[in-house]
């Protein structure tokens, strides 16, 4: 039978893999995970401690009157981040990973507790209106979060990204790309899966616009921007980024081709990088006996 993704997540993360969490713990950070929903989702109550998080905060740790539709608001989540920052010891370095719930799909039900403020002009897509109205609320909450940390004395870095685009009425997509969801080129398909991100600091740092990247590189970009020396694995990723600026399970951005290719279409130096990346990922996740202590040192 088939196994759910959550099952794989729980089965494979049974001891502490090398990750941003283990790397930051090794240099003295307290690592905190926050998710304003049930702790059993994706077995987070098991997986997060296995990843090395020192603290986990789930739905019972939040004010459950701060609800939009059926979910705790981004504003409440950000206030909890601020609370945890304000309660930290004076010499405590904090890494807080937060996964929000406010804008989770679907978007077709009507709610008494949500006044939708954004409407498409000339198009009747209630689900799109609801989604855009939720994003509007997220913008306000994000303004609160950044304004708060703009004014603290400690250096702070915020890495902000979504995990996927919303699932909306299929009949809406021709208005976006002129084609809908079928017959798309690899580049057009990748566009549908592309999400925005930013890294913000409350200290002076050079503004850089990355035309394209992928989530596997965000921890490396965050460490670089924070001025933290890159562990060997992140240095590998920083070097790989020069040749393969974006990669996911479907394909990768090929500089030589000037667009997205399927993984199996890679040749030459691009194929070498992808092959070595596969070897390192396997070594970190599955190779219990021969794990490279250079790339994947155990938690000290």
What are these regions (language model features)?
Residues 2-300:
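Solvent-exposed soluble domains appended to multi-pass membrane proteins
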């Amino acid at each position: 039978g088939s196994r759910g993704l959550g099952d794989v997540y729980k089965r494979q993360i049974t001891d502490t893999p090398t990750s941003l969490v283990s790397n930051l713990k090794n240099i003295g950070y307290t690592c905190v995970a926050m998710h304003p929903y049930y702790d059993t989702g994706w077995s987070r109550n098991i997986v997060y401690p296995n990843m090395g998080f020192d603290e986990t905060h789930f739905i019972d740790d939040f004010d459950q009157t701060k609800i939009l539709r059926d979910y705790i608001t981004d504003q409440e989540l950000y206030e909890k981040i601020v609370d945890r920052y304000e309660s930290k010891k004076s010499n405590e370095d904090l890494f807080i990973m937060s996964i929000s719930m406010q804008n989770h799909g679907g978007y077709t039900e009507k709610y008494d507790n949500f006044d939708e403020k954004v409407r498409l002009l000339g198009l009747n897509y209630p689900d799109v209106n609801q989604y855009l109205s939720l994003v509007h609320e997220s913008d306000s909450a994000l303004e609160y979060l950044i304004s708060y940390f703009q004014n603290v004395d400690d250096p702070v870095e915020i890495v902000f990204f979504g995990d996927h685009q919303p699932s909306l009425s299929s009949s809406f997509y021709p208005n976006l790309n002129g084609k809908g969801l079928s017959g798309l080129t690899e580049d057009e398909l990748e566009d549908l899966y592309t999400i925005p991100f930013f890294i913000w600091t409350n200290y002076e740092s050079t503004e850089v616009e990355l035309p394209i990247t992928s989530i596997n590189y965000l921890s490396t970009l965050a460490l670089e921007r924070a001025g933290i020396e890159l562990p060997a694995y992140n240095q590998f990723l920083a070097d790989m980024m020069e040749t393969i600026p974006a990669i996911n399970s479907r394909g990768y951005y090929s500089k030589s081709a000037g667009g997205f290719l399927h993984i199996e279409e890679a040749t030459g130096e691009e194929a070498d990088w992808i092959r070595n990346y596969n070897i390192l990922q396997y070594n970190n996740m599955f190779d219990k006996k021969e794990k490279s202590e250079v790339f994947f040192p155990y938690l000290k």
